[in-house]
Design a protein with these regions (language model features):
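Helix-loop boundary and gating motifs at the non-cytosolic
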Residues: 2-59, 105-109
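Central cavity-lining transmembrane alpha-helices of secondary-active solute carriers
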Residues: 25, 48-71, 92-93, 155-158
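Transmembrane alpha-helix termini and helix-breaking/packing motifs in multi-pass membrane transporters
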Residues: 27-38, 154-178
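Loop-to-transmembrane helix entry/capping segments in MFS-fold secondary transporters
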Residues: 45-49, 136-147, 180
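C-terminal ends and interior cores of transmembrane alpha-helices
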Residues: 63, 83-105
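Hydrophobic alpha-helical transmembrane and interfacial-helix anchor sites in secondary transporters
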Residues: 69-74, 164
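Glycine-rich segments within core transmembrane alpha-helices of 12-TM secondary carriers
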Residues: 116, 140-165
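Intracellular juxtamembrane helix-capping segments at the cytosolic ends
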Residues: 119-138
Length: 184
């Protein structure tokens, strides 16, 4: 196999983009926004329960799907198409979070679970592509490049979102009530 630099960089830059979901949505702002905007802010135990259930349900769904998706990925002919499908599914549902009105926690949880299933499922196909773009000798260095770019991309977007959240007046196009919606 001859290594193609363009394929290596494309693979690594996907991690740059998809790690932003993990840092910004999953770890950073969805839990905050869920508790303060969609769920009842006066009942943190209830919102913690709903968010915990959402995380449990998506994890169970992904655990059930993973062996089947992994088998499909091992066959090799549909890796890229399925990566695109699941990434698109996750992107659409994440983008949809910005149109969900305050108090509609059920819809927010549904969109979040579908987005996270898309994110996790796309990673199955993303991970399987490394053997198609890197020689056995280079797998570690290519994987490290993707991992490093993922941390960089996720960290930079998280920093930008923290600034947007703490100092919304820096960004004129944000409206006070919906400032967090644009984080998604």
């Amino acid at each position: 196999m001859k290594e193609n630099r363009r394929s290596v960089w494309s693979w690594a830059l996907y991690d740059w983009a998809n790690s932003a979901y993990a840092t910004t949505v999953m770890a950073g702002f969805f839990p905050i926004f869920f508790k303060e905007y969609w769920a009842d802010p006066n009942n943190p135990n209830q919102s913690t329960f709903y968010l915990g259930m959402a995380n449990s349900i998506y994890a169970i769904v992904v655990a059930a799907l993973a062996p089947f998706l992994g088998a499909i990925a091992d066959q090799g002919s549909k890796k890229k198409k399925l990566l695109i499908f699941f990434a698109f599914m996750g992107s659409i549902m994440t983008g949809g979070l910005c149109i969900i009105n305050q108090g509609h926690w059920q819809l927010a949880v549904l969109f979040y679970m579908i987005a996270t299933i898309g994110y996790a499922s796309s990673n199955i196909f993303y991970d399987s592509l490394i053997t198609d773009i890197a020689t056995e000798k280079k797998v570690d260095s290519v994987s490290s490049l993707g991992y490093g770019l993922g941390y960089l991309g996720g960290g930079l977007l998280f920093l930008l979102n923290v600034i947007m959240y703490l100092k919304p007046h820096f960004l004129v196009f944000l409206m006070e009530q919906q400032q967090l919606n644009f984080l998604f």
